[in-house]
């Protein structure tokens, strides 16, 4: 049994509109296609993170509790996926699970950012727990000039070493599977204040998003197949 917990990215207040926008986000696709065991999906916070029910912290907490409620020692494994602030949420979940003696088989991060005081250590991002076996981390290139007002989180492991990641030329939205559809005239995408124009066109953003999906999903599938094989053995992944 392989448990999946996903937390998606920042979006609009209205849940129906949010669901439509994020219908094909990478976290959502992983959730919808998950057949290896119990699965849970949390929408992301609103921009100001002021919608109580969807606080980044509460999304992380619900994910954590879901894993705990389904975990069976020696029989289970955990895959966590997060986009944008959802990435910060699942990084935190991995740390909380470590404190319960539960490892994370695969941590999937789509351009994670920590723009809330609810996650991480005081004034410092939470590092990746040493109980995470496989990390799939997709990060936007600086040359894309997307969301320059904030950087990424999860860039350091628990031992201080740099987290392995792969960069893609796309916007922050494209990295999460929600690439921009405007402007249709072929100009550079304008993300609005405070960042404004990127160096990415709509076509580039779609191409970048496709590249992220191909790269990350291939790695997730590899990790999933390996985990299923090990889980079928008497000393499954929880014991390794």
Residue ranges and their predicted role:
Residues 1-78:
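Active-site catalytic motif of lipid deacylating hydrolases and related acyltransferases
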Residues 29-33, 66-70, 93-96, 100, ...:
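Structured segments of extracytoplasmic/periplasmic soluble domains
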Residues 60-154:
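Serine-dependent carboxylesterase/thioesterase catalytic core
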